[in-house]
UniProtKB/Swiss-Prot annotation:
This is Snake venom serine protease KN9. Expressed by the venom gland. Residues 1-18 form the signal peptide. Keywords: Disulfide bond, Glycoprotein, Hemostasis impairing toxin, Hydrolase, Protease, Secreted, Serine protease, Signal, Toxin, Zymogen. Disulfide bonds join 31-162, 49-65, 141-209, 173-188, 199-224. It comes from Trimeresurus stejnegeri (Chinese green tree viper). It comes from the Eukaryota. Monomer. The lineage of its organism: Eukaryota, Metazoa, Chordata, Craniata, Vertebrata. Residues 19-24 form a propeptide. Its main location: secreted. One of its GO terms (biological process) is proteolysis. Belongs to the peptidase S1 family. Snake venom subfamily. The keyword Signal applies. GO terms for cellular component: extracellular region; secretory granule.
Length: 257
């Protein structure tokens, strides 16, 4: 059974989108405190997601992480003992991929957020670069988040966990997710032997390849980290023109073909 897992208590957001849920990193280790300056902890209507700072005023997360009350925390490592330079913001404006008013779990799971106030770069806060080109198959990439570290139990860590996974042939994901379109604007990534994966609590977080954000956590298997069940990530490169247009002030930007 496949589900889109929104973090924390697996609460169901009452949105115009479809039913959703989130993910967390299984099989990883504690992230280095100085190597995730772009990572955002998102609290939305009592549910947890991840996100990525892409410049001092803008961030990316998954569309299914949307909610009426969103709190965005930057510069965080330990949730119990926050860094002194932690900063908190709320959305000033949220933008969704505008080809369709309806959310689908295979496409359009991307949300661009303009912050109510720019964040200040600091020891633990700095943006991550947008992609210059898409990742190739077998590229080693990094996942991270405060999601559950158990594939079957809700065990949420105090600090984010990181793991390395690979870009996988899209055909592998289509075999497990029969609704996935052949030309879907997504990436398939994971470890085919199993053991490392996103899980509950990681939705919206980054897939980082060669120092750039290439994916946004969208859909995974249940339980997490099963063999031959990679996860699906929104492909940031395929949304790059839209992202840049919105940031430049063209809020009527349409989807690329």
């Amino acid at each position: 059974m496949v589900l889109i897992r929104v973090l924390a208590n697996l609460l169901i957001l009452q949105l115009s989108y479809a039913q959703k849920s989130s993910e967390l990193v299984v099989g990883g280790d504690e992230c280095n405190i100085n190597e995730h300056r772009f990572l955002v902890l998102v609290y939305t209507d009592g549910i947890q997601c991840g996100g990525t700072l892409i410049n001092k005023e803008w961030m990316l997360t998954a569309a299914h992480c949307d909610g009426k009350k969103m709190k965005l925390q930057f510069g965080l490592h330990s949730k119990n003992v926050p860094n002194k330079d932690k900063q908190t913001r709320v959305p000033k404006k949220k933008y969704f991929f505008p080809c369709s008013k309806n959310f689908t779990k295979w496409d359009k799971d991307i949300m661009l957020i303009r912050l109510n106030h720019p964040v200040n770069n600091s020891t633990h806060i700095a943006p991550l670069s947008l992609p210059s080109k898409p990742p190739s198959q077998d590229t080693v990439c990094n996942i991270m988040g405060w999601g559950t570290i158990s594939p079957t139990k809700e065990i949420y860590p105090d600090v984010p966990h990181c793991a390395n996974i690979n870009i996988v042939d899209h055909a592998v994901c289509r075999a497990f997710y029969p609704g996935l379109l052949e030309k879907s604007k997504t990436l398939c990534a994971g470890i085919l032997e199993g053991g490392k994966d996103i899980c509950q609590g990681d939705s919206g977080g980054p897939l980082i390849c060669n120092g750039q954000i290439q994916g946004i956590v969208s859909v995974g298997g249940n339980p997490c980290a099963e063999p031959r069940v990679p996860a699906i990530y929104t492909k940031v490169f395929d949304h790059l023109d839209w992202i840049k247009s919105i940031i430049a002030g063209n809020t009527a930007a349409t989807c690329p073909l």
